[in-house]
A protein has these predicted regions:
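Alpha/beta enzyme core
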Residues: 1-92, 104-120, 145, 149
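Short active-site-adjacent structural elements
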Residues: 100-104, 122-124, 130-133
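C-terminal helical cap(s) of enzyme catalytic domains, especially alpha/beta-barrels
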Residues: 117-118, 129-155
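Proteins with a high burden of low-complexity, intrinsically disordered sequence enriched in S/T/G/P/A and R
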Residues: 1, 125, 153-155
Length: 155
């Protein structure tokens, strides 16, 4: 079973900042998915952290933010992997909506972040399928190359 563990709540937007993809909130969603015995967790790539503090929910110790994570994209994604029982349950990140010319670069960057964080893959549906066949195939092949490249390792 692949479980979409997206955090959705209007309260996750605070002072103009959107925390729907915050590492701490999505990490908790991943943990809940693992607890429900999902075989694979699908999650958005994290874009920030500190959602619990901003929304005034949870009792996360400050050291989680100061010592266990940084704002680096790989560390934020690694926090998601950690909440999947340290990768025992595979994490795949979603590729997001197609934005046009930057899709190839965005998909490769997301794949590198996911792989270096210990994730297991990337779903790039709209980025690949909402374009001409050759372009979509090139995008999928580029993602595959990231995961098959032995020099791209866990950071």
């Amino acid at each position: 079973t692949i479980l979409w563990c997206y955090a959705r709540n209007n309260g996750f937007k605070v002072d103009g900042v959107d925390y729907h993809s915050a590492a701490d909130l999505t990490g908790q969603a991943n943990h809940l998915g693992v607890t429900l015995q999902a075989d694979i967790i699908k999650q958005k790539i994290p874009t920030n952290n500190g959602g619990y503090n901003a929304t005034k929910h949870g009792k996360t110790h400050p050291k989680v933010y100061s010592e266990l994570t940084t704002d680096h994209p790989i560390d934020l994604c690694r926090f998601q992997v950690a909440n999947c029982y340290m990768g025992r349950i595979p994490l795949i990140n979603s590729g997001g909506e197609s934005k046009g010319a930057s899709d190839l670069a965005d998909a490769v960057k997301t794949a590198v972040i996911n792989k270096r964080a210990g994730g297991m893959g990337l779903i790039a549906g709209r980025k690949a399928f909402q374009r001409p066949w050759k372009e979509g195939l090139a995008l999928v092949n580029s993602i595959q190359h990231v995961y098959l490249e032995p020099r791209v390792t866990v950071a």
